[in-house]
């Protein structure tokens, strides 16, 4: 009977502690991923050793997640350090069938619902690209950003393209997103769900916006696309003299939202493995913030210790005490 009680108690303890240990591991993984993004946001390639070290730690905790994030960081670095930005029209060599979708990112409308010139400039690049790749779909993405209800960026963009010669059966509209991050999330889901023939995308937007958009679409498809992942194969930009610029803050913020982890731009992890100890100057955080920045939750003490103590109490309660020797024995 004592053996049975001990066994039941042991199993009960495992059942109590196991979920907490898993939760602790999940929080640890999240913290590591936050550090990886913060390192690249603040230091770029100068934090290569720290990022590599964090990726190794993440892989030890969760091999699948670790390998996924190694690829994410490789692609993110490529987007910022090696990817060419093409102007005027998409480059040569892209798929020439309906496996390609040209994704045109929206831009805030005027108060009356009309399009600003910069958005028209994007559409002119998109139309020329669509003529160069006549089998490709064209997806316009952008929600209601004017004072006129029912008028979306995507709707206005689509109407302009149709008026200027784009075939109706090539046009796809996504009219609910209100940020670049949502452009990537909602557009990707539409293509995954409704256009399985589409395997690759090319982004059309303003010159300062290309890397930001590319980073969001890359992260969305790598982290959530699975077997339906869309390959980013090209880009085309309209040239602007806009004071806006594609900030690393916007990229880091967008990737964090897509990865479902907090992002705190003021959190500066130290460089332990590199010579430089001060982060380079980063762009002012301000600018293009259409959504609230996710708050970083306060770290909680793990409750595994508490449950372990509870398990010990249960052991004491369930295990019978040895009978004391009486004087008559």
Segments (PLM) and residue ranges:
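Bacterial N-terminal signal peptides that target proteins for export
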Residues: 1-8
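Hydrophobic core
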Residues: 12-20
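N-terminal cationic leader/targeting segments used for protein routing and processing
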Residues: 23, 300, 323-326
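A structural signal for short, hydrophobic/glycine-enriched beta-strand patches
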Residues: 23-258
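Low-complexity, Gly/Ser/Thr/Pro-rich intrinsically disordered linker/tail segments
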Residues: 253-296
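Juxtamembrane/start-of-transmembrane alpha-helix segments at the extracytoplasmic/lumenal side
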Residues: 292-307
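Core hydrophobic alpha-helical transmembrane segments of single-pass membrane proteins
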Residues: 306-316
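C-terminal membrane-anchoring or membrane-association module
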Residues: 314-329
């Amino acid at each position: 009977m004592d053996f049975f009680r001990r066994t039941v108690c042991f199993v009960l303890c495992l059942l109590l502690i196991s979920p907490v240990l898993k939760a602790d591991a999940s929080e640890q993984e999240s913290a590591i991923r936050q550090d990886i993004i913060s390192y690249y946001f603040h230091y770029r390639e100068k934090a290569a050793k720290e990022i590599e070290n964090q990726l190794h730690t993440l892989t030890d905790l969760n091999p699948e997640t670790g390998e996924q994030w190694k690829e994410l960081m490789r692609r993110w670095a490529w987007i910022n350090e090696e990817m060419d930005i093409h102007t005027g029209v998409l480059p040569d060599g892209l798929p020439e069938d309906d496996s390609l979708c040209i994704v045109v990112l929206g831009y805030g409308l005027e108060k009356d619902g009309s399009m600003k010139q910069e958005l028209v400039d994007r559409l002119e690049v998109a139309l020329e690209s669509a003529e160069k790749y006549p089998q490709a779909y064209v997806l316009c993405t952008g929600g209601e950003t004017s004072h006129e209800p029912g008028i979306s960026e995507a709707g206005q963009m689509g109407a302009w393209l149709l008026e200027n010669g784009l075939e109706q059966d090539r046009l796809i509209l996504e009219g609910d997103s209100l940020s670049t991050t949502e452009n990537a999330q909602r557009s990707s889901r539409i293509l995954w769900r409704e256009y399985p023939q589409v395997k690759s995308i090319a982004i059309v937007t303003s010159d300062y916006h290309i890397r930001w958009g590319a980073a969001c679409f890359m992260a969305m498809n790598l982290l959530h696309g699975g077997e339906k992942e869309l390959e980013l194969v090209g880009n085309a930009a309209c040239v602007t003299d806009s004071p806006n610029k594609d900030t690393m803050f916007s990229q880091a913020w967008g990737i964090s939202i897509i990865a479902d982890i907090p992002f705190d731009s003021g959190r500066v992890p130290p460089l332990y493995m590199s010579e430089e100890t001060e982060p380079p100057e980063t762009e002012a955080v301000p600018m293009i913030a259409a959504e609230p920045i996710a708050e970083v939750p306060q770290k909680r003490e793990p409750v595994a210790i508490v449950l372990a103590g509870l398990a010990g109490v249960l052991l004491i309660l369930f295990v019978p005490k040895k009978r004391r020797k009486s004087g008559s024995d």
